[in-house]
Amino acid sequence: MRPLSLKGHERALTRVRFNREGDLTFSCAKDKKPCVWYTENGERIGSYDGHNGAVWDIDVSWDTSKCVTASGDLTVKIWDAELGSCIYTINHQTPMKSCGFSYSGNLVCYTTQKMTKNLSTVQVRDLRDGNQMAEGAESFFSTQFDVNATTALFSQMDDIITIGFESGLLQQYDLRNPDSPINTNEVVHRYSIQDLQLSPRGDFLISASRDKTAALLDVNDLKKLKQYKSERPVNSACIAPNRDHICLGGGEDAMQVTQTAVSAGHFEAKIYHMVFEEEFARFKGHFGPINTMAWHPSGSIIATGGEDGYVRIQEFDEDYLGFTYDF
């Protein structure tokens, strides 16, 4: 492993993502400046300035023309990815927790937190419709929940949205018939779902939870196919684009880190075989729990972001690339 350690954030990382080609890495943290980097050499290209609170999530459109950020300053912002200028700002009464583009890049979804009299909501807006993007405008899809929605993403083209909740519940809504969820899974996780990621081919979802497990799910019906067990809460999980492997990241909760030996904290990223559910490799690097991770489209790089404020770009060596699993 030849890691690049990128220092551009003052506080804990909340999300790292690659664009579709993998030449750019996008990151955001609990400081107020999302950053974009060259994946090849770790050089920082710049930051997106405009938020006034922790940035919880970032996503980039398929053509890398736009990116979207969700922040604790009660706004979601749509940016010109190349110029760094803010195109739209969406305001709400409570903090925004997650956001994402649809397959086409024309729709954006985001989740808001439950606070005082305001329920948690998931909303979708169409960037092509100027009326929806105007200040104070209504979104074309909005649904409310009594429990916090922690993460949401488009799981099938521009039609179906998958939502993960603080209670461990998973639900899917079809935007063409949005009155009630089309699929629900209440038993896959016992505690909060920290992360949901789609496989590169779009046929699987992987969920990471505080109940110390990650689950591989069928994207069509949310049926649990495989489960991967860890010794500590799992904050993020991702699927390899060209191998039957998945990677988990997490570790001892950040609040308890000072009472934990580094070896006992399980701050390593762990690689499992997707089918056999067996861990066969792990790599160290972060001093503290891993909060977010993403697998590069080439399959030869993993980016991780930790509570220590660093983004680490880990490039696999021949031991991994030439590895074949013994049946």
Swiss-Prot record:
Which Gene3D superfamilies does its entry note?
Answer: YVTN repeat-like/Quinoprotein amine dehydrogenase
A single GO CC term for this protein reads: eukaryotic 43S preinitiation complex
> Which keywords fit this entry according to its UniProt record?
Cytoplasm, Initiation factor, Protein biosynthesis, Repeat, WD repeat
Task: Show me the WD repeat boundaries.
Answer: 8-49, 51-89, 188-227, 229-268, 285-324
Q: Which GO terms describe its biological process?
A: cytoplasmic translational initiation; formation of cytoplasmic translation initiation complex
Which GO terms label this protein's molecular function in UniProt? RNA binding; translation initiation factor activity
Highest taxon of the lineage: Eukaryota
Pfam families documented for this protein: EIF3I
Subcellular location(s) of the protein: Cytoplasm
Q: What is its main location?
A: cytoplasm
Name the family the entry cites: Belongs to the eIF-3 subunit I family.
Q: What is the role of this chain? A: Component of the eukaryotic translation initiation factor 3 (eIF-3) complex, which is involved in protein synthesis of a specialized repertoire of mRNAs and, together with other initiation factors, stimulates binding of mRNA and methionyl-tRNAi to the 40S ribosome. The eIF-3 complex specifically targets and initiates translation of a subset of mRNAs involved in cell proliferation.
Quote the subunit structure annotation: Component of the eukaryotic translation initiation factor 3 (eIF-3) complex.
Q: What is this protein called?
A: Eukaryotic translation initiation factor 3 subunit I
- State which gene encodes it: eif-3.I
